[in-house]
Amino acid sequence: VNWLPVCADAHGFVVNRGLFEQYGIPLPTDYESFVSACQAFEEVGIRGFTADYTYDYTCMETLQGLSAAELTTTAGRKWRTAYSDPANTARVGLDDTVWPGAFERMAQFIQDTHLTADDLAHTYDDVTGMFRNGEAAMYFGSSAGVKVFQDEGIDTTFLPFFSQNGEKWIMTTPYFQ
């Protein structure tokens, strides 16, 4: 099962569409254009992308969002099922099938978004403050953030994770194995 009809909070990229229009930068449609947008914003002194990495769940969701294609393969599903099964008493570590590629993609994402050690201290309030003040064009967040900023008069939209293989993924809470 890849999809179930339930209510969920979608997690992906909250985007200040107004900044994109103001600087003539196209909205990303794939990973390459996401990286190009980040670079274009940095050239004008605006952070292209950031996230509240002080929280471990943000790091995990980013890793999962970038690797959704692998995590939905047979090997990925087998690993996730064993890892998350509360009845499983065997220790389940990271395998050598799914995870090497996942960490390679995360390393590339860190480079492409120019993540630094200072970013690891960003809280939700820090990140949304940067976004609200036009200091960041995109941040990792939930679909609820779009409405919050739209209510404040900021032209905001929501984009998925762009996989380097061309696929697009949105993380949801709750999630299903």
Can you describe what each PLM-predicted range is?
Residues Q22-Y23, D112, Q150-Q177:
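Extracytoplasmic/periplasmic substrate-recognition and gating elements
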Residues C38-A40, T81-D119:
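Glycine-centered hinge/linker elements that transmit conformational signals in sensory
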